[in-house]
Protein backbone atom coordinates (compact mmCIF):
# COMPACT_ATOMS: atom_id res chain seq x y z
CA UNK A 1 0.00 0.00 0.00
CA UNK A 2 1.41 3.40 -1.00
CA UNK A 3 0.56 6.13 1.52
CA UNK A 4 1.28 9.82 0.81
CA UNK A 5 2.90 11.54 3.81
CA UNK A 6 4.37 14.80 5.00
CA UNK A 7 7.06 14.76 7.68
CA UNK A 8 7.03 17.87 9.88
CA UNK A 9 8.62 19.03 13.09
CA UNK A 10 7.97 21.49 15.85
CA UNK A 11 11.33 22.31 17.45
CA UNK A 12 12.65 18.89 16.50
CA UNK A 13 9.62 16.97 17.79
CA UNK A 14 8.91 15.25 14.48
CA UNK A 15 5.92 13.28 13.25
CA UNK A 16 4.82 11.75 9.99
CA UNK A 17 1.52 13.37 8.97
CA UNK A 18 -1.07 11.59 6.84
CA UNK A 19 -3.92 13.56 5.26
CA UNK A 20 -7.18 11.60 5.47
CA UNK A 21 -9.28 14.27 3.77
CA UNK A 22 -8.63 12.66 0.38
CA UNK A 23 -7.20 9.30 1.41
CA UNK A 24 -8.73 6.47 3.48
CA UNK A 25 -6.91 3.97 5.69
CA UNK A 26 -8.62 1.18 7.63
CA UNK A 27 -8.58 2.16 11.31
CA UNK A 28 -7.47 -1.33 12.34
CA UNK A 29 -4.12 -0.59 10.65
CA UNK A 30 -3.33 2.60 12.59
CA UNK A 31 -1.42 0.89 15.41
CA UNK A 32 0.88 -1.12 13.15
CA UNK A 33 1.25 1.70 10.62
CA UNK A 34 2.48 4.04 13.36
CA UNK A 35 5.11 1.51 14.44
CA UNK A 36 6.30 0.85 10.89
CA UNK A 37 6.36 4.44 9.71
CA UNK A 38 8.17 5.67 12.85
CA UNK A 39 10.99 3.12 12.64
CA UNK A 40 14.25 4.95 11.99
CA UNK A 41 15.81 1.97 10.19
CA UNK A 42 12.97 0.52 8.10
CA UNK A 43 10.43 3.35 8.05
CA UNK A 44 10.48 7.12 7.68
CA UNK A 45 11.74 7.59 11.24
CA UNK A 46 9.86 9.85 13.64
CA UNK A 47 8.50 10.38 17.14
CA UNK A 48 5.18 9.02 15.89
CA UNK A 49 2.36 9.46 13.39
CA UNK A 50 -0.40 12.07 13.21
CA UNK A 51 -3.55 11.63 11.15
CA UNK A 52 -5.22 14.81 9.87
CA UNK A 53 -8.88 14.02 9.29
CA UNK A 54 -12.34 15.51 8.68
CA UNK A 55 -14.62 16.06 11.66
CA UNK A 56 -18.06 17.55 12.15
CA UNK A 57 -17.08 19.16 15.47
CA UNK A 58 -14.23 21.43 14.31
CA UNK A 59 -12.50 22.69 11.17
CA UNK A 60 -9.99 19.84 11.22
CA UNK A 61 -9.28 16.82 13.40
CA UNK A 62 -6.02 15.15 14.41
CA UNK A 63 -5.17 11.81 16.00
CA UNK A 64 -1.75 11.19 17.53
CA UNK A 65 0.03 7.84 17.63
CA UNK A 66 3.32 7.34 19.46
CA UNK A 67 6.10 5.35 17.84
CA UNK A 68 5.15 2.32 19.94
CA UNK A 69 1.69 2.41 18.32
CA UNK A 70 -0.16 3.71 21.38
CA UNK A 71 -2.59 6.57 20.83
CA UNK A 72 -2.13 9.89 22.61
CA UNK A 73 -4.78 12.45 23.37
CA UNK A 74 -2.99 15.71 22.59
CA UNK A 75 0.34 17.05 21.32
CA UNK A 76 1.28 20.72 21.33
CA UNK A 77 3.94 20.49 18.63
CA UNK A 78 1.62 18.29 16.60
CA UNK A 79 -1.14 20.88 16.88
CA UNK A 80 1.12 23.60 15.50
CA UNK A 81 2.21 21.41 12.59
CA UNK A 82 -1.38 20.36 11.90
CA UNK A 83 -2.40 24.02 11.84
CA UNK A 84 0.38 24.82 9.37
CA UNK A 85 -0.54 21.88 7.15
CA UNK A 86 -4.26 22.66 7.22
CA UNK A 87 -3.74 26.30 6.23
CA UNK A 88 -1.05 25.76 3.60
CA UNK A 89 -2.98 22.90 1.96
CA UNK A 90 -6.31 24.72 1.81
CA UNK A 91 -8.17 22.60 4.36
CA UNK A 92 -8.90 25.89 6.13
CA UNK A 93 -8.85 29.40 4.67
CA UNK A 94 -9.19 31.53 7.79
CA UNK A 95 -6.10 32.28 9.89
CA UNK A 96 -8.03 31.46 13.05
CA UNK A 97 -9.72 28.05 13.25
CA UNK A 98 -10.38 25.05 15.49
CA UNK A 99 -8.67 21.65 15.74
CA UNK A 100 -10.19 18.62 17.43
CA UNK A 101 -8.02 16.13 19.36
CA UNK A 102 -8.95 13.17 21.54
CA UNK A 103 -8.59 15.51 24.53
CA UNK A 104 -10.51 18.60 23.42
CA UNK A 105 -11.10 21.19 20.72
CA UNK A 106 -8.53 23.99 20.60
CA UNK A 107 -8.30 27.32 18.83
CA UNK A 108 -5.35 27.87 16.49
CA UNK A 109 -4.14 31.06 14.87
CA UNK A 110 -1.46 31.11 12.18
CA UNK A 111 0.98 33.90 11.37
CA UNK A 112 1.56 33.96 7.60
CA UNK A 113 4.32 35.47 5.45
CA UNK A 114 4.25 35.00 1.65
CA UNK A 115 1.53 32.34 2.02
CA UNK A 116 3.72 30.31 4.38
CA UNK A 117 2.94 29.79 8.06
CA UNK A 118 5.92 30.79 10.22
CA UNK A 119 4.36 30.84 13.71
CA UNK A 120 1.32 29.21 15.27
CA UNK A 121 -0.45 30.20 18.47
CA UNK A 122 -2.64 27.60 20.17
CA UNK A 123 -5.10 28.02 23.02
CA UNK A 124 -4.22 24.80 24.84
CA UNK A 125 -7.18 25.13 27.18
CA UNK A 126 -7.32 24.89 30.96
CA UNK A 127 -4.86 22.75 32.91
CA UNK A 128 -6.29 19.83 34.86
CA UNK A 129 -4.91 19.65 38.39
CA UNK A 130 -7.11 17.22 40.35
CA UNK A 131 -5.14 14.06 41.12
CA UNK A 132 -7.81 11.65 39.88
CA UNK A 133 -8.06 13.51 36.58
CA UNK A 134 -4.29 13.44 35.85
CA UNK A 135 -4.75 10.48 36.61
CA UNK A 136 -2.57 9.65 39.62
CA UNK A 137 -3.39 7.27 42.45
CA UNK A 138 -4.16 8.76 45.85
CA UNK A 139 -6.54 11.29 47.42
CA UNK A 140 -8.87 12.02 44.52
CA UNK A 141 -9.45 15.76 44.26
CA UNK A 142 -6.23 17.12 45.77
CA UNK A 143 -3.67 19.00 43.66
CA UNK A 144 -0.26 17.38 43.41
CA UNK A 145 2.15 20.26 44.05
CA UNK A 146 5.76 19.63 45.15
CA UNK A 147 4.71 16.29 46.62
CA UNK A 148 7.42 13.86 47.81
CA UNK A 149 7.77 11.04 45.28
CA UNK A 150 10.07 8.11 46.03
CA UNK A 151 11.56 6.50 42.94
CA UNK A 152 14.65 4.30 42.57
CA UNK A 153 15.23 4.63 46.31
CA UNK A 154 15.44 8.44 46.25
CA UNK A 155 12.93 11.16 47.07
CA UNK A 156 12.06 13.50 44.23
CA UNK A 157 9.33 16.16 44.32
CA UNK A 158 6.56 16.03 41.75
CA UNK A 159 3.98 18.52 40.52
CA UNK A 160 1.37 16.82 38.32
CA UNK A 161 -0.52 18.60 35.53
CA UNK A 162 -2.68 17.36 32.68
CA UNK A 163 -2.91 19.36 29.47
CA UNK A 164 -5.16 16.73 27.91
CA UNK A 165 -2.34 14.27 28.58
CA UNK A 166 -0.58 13.65 31.93
CA UNK A 167 2.70 15.28 32.96
CA UNK A 168 4.90 14.81 36.01
CA UNK A 169 7.11 17.88 36.50
CA UNK A 170 10.31 17.78 38.58
CA UNK A 171 12.46 20.84 39.30
CA UNK A 172 16.26 20.51 39.22
CA UNK A 173 19.16 22.88 39.85
CA UNK A 174 21.03 21.98 36.65
CA UNK A 175 19.17 20.73 33.57
CA UNK A 176 22.35 19.13 32.21
CA UNK A 177 22.45 16.82 35.23
CA UNK A 178 18.76 15.87 35.11
CA UNK A 179 18.40 12.04 35.35
CA UNK A 180 16.27 11.88 32.22
CA UNK A 181 17.54 8.60 30.78
CA UNK A 182 17.44 6.75 34.11
CA UNK A 183 14.34 8.08 35.85
CA UNK A 184 12.31 9.01 32.76
CA UNK A 185 11.29 5.46 31.78
CA UNK A 186 10.90 4.39 35.41
CA UNK A 187 8.52 7.22 36.29
CA UNK A 188 6.64 6.88 32.98
CA UNK A 189 5.58 3.32 33.83
CA UNK A 190 5.22 3.79 37.61
CA UNK A 191 2.11 2.05 38.95
CA UNK A 192 0.97 5.32 40.56
CA UNK A 193 0.02 6.51 37.08
CA UNK A 194 -2.75 4.25 35.69
CA UNK A 195 -2.30 5.63 32.16
CA UNK A 196 1.50 6.13 32.54
CA UNK A 197 2.87 9.70 32.33
CA UNK A 198 5.13 12.14 30.50
CA UNK A 199 8.14 13.18 32.59
CA UNK A 200 9.65 16.68 32.60
CA UNK A 201 12.73 18.03 34.36
CA UNK A 202 12.78 21.81 34.70
CA UNK A 203 15.48 24.30 35.66
CA UNK A 204 14.30 27.80 36.57
CA UNK A 205 16.64 30.24 34.83
CA UNK A 206 14.77 33.40 35.82
CA UNK A 207 11.18 34.48 36.59
CA UNK A 208 10.57 34.53 32.82
CA UNK A 209 12.71 31.61 31.59
CA UNK A 210 12.74 27.85 32.08
CA UNK A 211 15.10 25.16 30.81
CA UNK A 212 13.24 21.99 29.86
CA UNK A 213 13.93 18.33 29.10
CA UNK A 214 11.33 15.63 28.51
CA UNK A 215 10.80 11.89 28.47
CA UNK A 216 7.59 11.41 26.48
CA UNK A 217 5.16 8.64 27.23
CA UNK A 218 5.41 6.05 24.46
CA UNK A 219 8.28 7.80 22.67
CA UNK A 220 11.14 8.36 25.12
CA UNK A 221 13.48 11.36 24.90
CA UNK A 222 12.33 13.92 22.33
CA UNK A 223 13.60 17.35 21.32
CA UNK A 224 10.43 19.14 22.40
CA UNK A 225 6.97 18.66 23.88
CA UNK A 226 4.41 21.45 23.59
CA UNK A 227 1.96 20.15 26.18
CA UNK A 228 4.94 19.48 28.45
CA UNK A 229 6.13 23.08 28.11
CA UNK A 230 2.62 24.24 29.05
CA UNK A 231 2.58 21.87 32.03
CA UNK A 232 6.02 23.14 33.09
CA UNK A 233 4.82 26.76 33.19
CA UNK A 234 1.70 25.77 35.15
CA UNK A 235 3.84 23.76 37.59
CA UNK A 236 6.33 26.61 37.98
CA UNK A 237 3.46 29.00 38.68
CA UNK A 238 1.92 26.67 41.27
CA UNK A 239 5.34 26.46 42.97
CA UNK A 240 5.67 30.29 42.88
CA UNK A 241 8.73 30.19 40.65
CA UNK A 242 7.12 32.28 37.89
CA UNK A 243 4.14 34.66 37.79
CA UNK A 244 0.78 33.92 36.19
CA UNK A 245 -0.31 36.03 33.18
CA UNK A 246 3.29 36.75 32.20
CA UNK A 247 4.84 35.28 29.03
CA UNK A 248 7.44 32.63 29.86
CA UNK A 249 10.14 31.48 27.45
CA UNK A 250 10.69 27.74 27.70
CA UNK A 251 14.05 26.57 26.33
CA UNK A 252 13.62 23.06 24.94
CA UNK A 253 16.37 20.95 23.38
CA UNK A 254 14.98 21.81 19.93
CA UNK A 255 14.35 25.52 20.49
CA UNK A 256 12.09 27.95 22.34
CA UNK A 257 8.36 28.14 22.99
CA UNK A 258 6.49 31.11 24.42
CA UNK A 259 3.92 30.04 27.01
CA UNK A 260 1.44 32.12 28.99
CA UNK A 261 -1.04 30.90 31.61
CA UNK A 262 -3.60 33.68 31.50
CA UNK A 263 -6.05 34.92 34.13
CA UNK A 264 -8.94 33.18 32.35
CA UNK A 265 -7.11 29.92 33.23
CA UNK A 266 -6.26 29.12 29.60
CA UNK A 267 -2.68 28.29 28.61
CA UNK A 268 -1.45 29.76 25.33
CA UNK A 269 1.49 28.42 23.34
CA UNK A 270 3.32 30.11 20.46
CA UNK A 271 6.05 28.53 18.36
CA UNK A 272 7.20 27.44 14.90
CA UNK A 273 6.27 24.50 12.68
CA UNK A 274 8.33 23.24 9.74
CA UNK A 275 7.96 20.83 6.83
CA UNK A 276 10.85 18.35 6.48
CA UNK A 277 9.81 16.19 3.54
CA UNK A 278 6.93 14.79 1.52
CA UNK A 279 6.69 11.45 -0.24
CA UNK A 280 5.15 7.99 -0.40
CA UNK A 281 5.47 5.35 2.32
CA UNK A 282 5.26 1.74 1.19
CA UNK A 283 3.27 0.08 3.96
CA UNK A 284 3.46 -3.69 4.33
CA UNK A 285 0.29 -4.97 5.95
CA UNK A 286 1.08 -7.80 8.36
UniProtKB/Swiss-Prot annotation:
Binding residues for substrate: 13, 66, 76-77, 165, 198, 216-217, 226-227
Gene Ontology molecular function terms on file: diaminopimelate epimerase activity
Biological or metabolic pathway of the protein: Amino-acid biosynthesis; L-lysine biosynthesis via DAP pathway; DL-2,6-diaminopimelate from LL-2,6-diaminopimelate: step 1/1
Site positions (Could be important to modulate the pK values of the two catalytic cysteine residues): 167, 216
Pfam families xref list: DAP_epimerase
Protein's GO biological process: lysine biosynthetic process via diaminopimelate
InterPro entries, per database record: DAP_epimerase_AS, DAP_epimerase_DapF
PROSITE patterns: DAP_EPIMERASE
Keyword set, alphabetical order: Amino-acid biosynthesis, Cytoplasm, Isomerase, Lysine biosynthesis
Main subcellular localisation: cytoplasm
Keyword Disulfide bond included in the entry's annotation: no
EC class of the enzyme, as a word: isomerase
GO CC terms in record: cytosol
Enzyme active site: 75, 225
EC number: 5.1.1.7
Family: Belongs to the diaminopimelate epimerase family.
Function text: Catalyzes the stereoinversion of LL-2,6-diaminopimelate (L,L-DAP) to meso-diaminopimelate (meso-DAP), a precursor of L-lysine and an essential component of the bacterial peptidoglycan.
Protein name per the record: Diaminopimelate epimerase
Gene it is expressed from: dapF
